[in-house]
Amino acid sequence: MDLRKFDIIKSNANTIFMQVYQPSQMQLDKLNGLMRTRNMYASTATPVGTRATVTIEPALYKEVASHWPSGVAVITAADNDGKLNGLTMSAVIALSLSPMQFLISVDKRSLTLPIIKDGGRFCINFLSSSQADIAMQFASKSTDKLASVKHRISQWGLPIIDGVVASITCDVHSIMPGGDHELIVGDVLDIEHFGGEALVHFKRAFHTIP
């Protein structure tokens, strides 16, 4: 169809519609207002696929994150020379059932991270409700955190802390960057369930489940 003819037909159709419908001035004003609002949002919205630049204070991020209850674990590891270390962590995720995998998030500054990478294995110790002191011990910068903590070395060569609810031993499957942390996916080698009540972290304090 000739585009000029199409424009004439379209214009005539709009004219006929306005003559038949005859909207009030109030309705026209409302429609114009809606169109202006739509155009305003269309011009300011962030296009899909682009990253919005919003400044969020780290303190707010931490405060909001602290309102998410989580279990508390100590991740233990051993390097190829037998050096042991560990760290306290709440960022533990049961990632997959088939195959069985867990994910942990380790700060890039952690002294335990290079040990995990070197040994290629780690153990997740789920702390019990009576082990808040152990959580604090492994959250410290001490280089010999296991010295004052009762534990045994498993058949996989990793420390399992006495009195924990459960332990999960994993082989490192993959490591990927996650901001100022590294995300480590582990294939489950062994699980030991000892029972008991788990330690919970909520609002920057340790709690027990009643």
Give the label of every model feature segment.
Residues 2-210:
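Basic, polyanion-binding surface patches
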